[in-house]
A protein has these predicted regions:
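C-terminal and inter-domain tail/linker signature
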Residues: 1-192
Length: 192
């Protein structure tokens, strides 16, 4: 919607842009993947996920992030959140607003988890259940409504840590379950 110039979500905390591919320009694979490299990537993203979900109840703390992420990491976030550069930028632009606005209820797991060489990822449909504490994307109020968050997460590993993350969140679905219909809101803005 933002690429069409439709602004139904308040200003993002990070940069909103057309999201590029991997910095190393190796997003397209023209030969068979190295199984050992693929396994390293999968193990790293699973370790990071387990630390996040099981260890800290979906809270990203800087000291934990440095265990799995390069300090100059880039997080390519979805509309309403935007991109963040460095761990400090990620904490400020995504983690804090996410944790301030949502309460983690449940992790449902992933439908698919896979890696090829230094790239890997997963998706869940839905993979999270969250409850609004108020203020998420400037659109929600605190309530006891639990909403499904459908997420696609893709990663690039550089050595022993993660360097890039592309995340796609189905905000249309998530917010509609909370009573915020972005498509209807767009219609109302268009007709006024």
């Amino acid at each position: 919607m933002q690429q069409l110039g439709l602004s139904v979500i308040p200003e993002s905390t990070g940069l909103v842009c057309v999201t590029p591919g991997p910095m190393n320009h190796r997003g397209l694979k023209y030969k068979l993947s190295d199984d050992a490299e693929s396994q390293k990537t999968l193990e790293l993203i699973h370790r990071m996920r387990d630390r996040l979900v099981k260890g800290s109840n979906m809270k990203s703390y800087k000291d934990e992030l440095t265990l799995d992420w390069h300090d100059d990491m880039i997080w390519w976030g979805p509309g309403g959140i935007g991109a963040s550069y460095t761990i400090d930028g990620y904490v400020k632009g995504h983690t804090k607003p996410f944790q301030d606005g949502l309460e983690f209820i449940k992790f449902n797991g992933h439908v698919l988890s896979s890696a090829e060489d230094d790239l890997g990822g997963w998706f869940g449909w839905p993979n999270l259940v969250m409850k609004p504490k108020g203020g998420y994307l400037g659109l929600t109020t605190a309530s006891d409504i639990e909403s499904e968050m459908r997420v696609v997460d893709l990663y690039r590993r550089d050595g022993y840590k993660l360097a890039e993350n592309w995340i796609f969140i189905d905000h249309l679905h998530f917010l509609k379950l909370l009573g915020v219909d972005l498509l209807e809101k767009n219609k109302q803005l268009s007709y006024n």
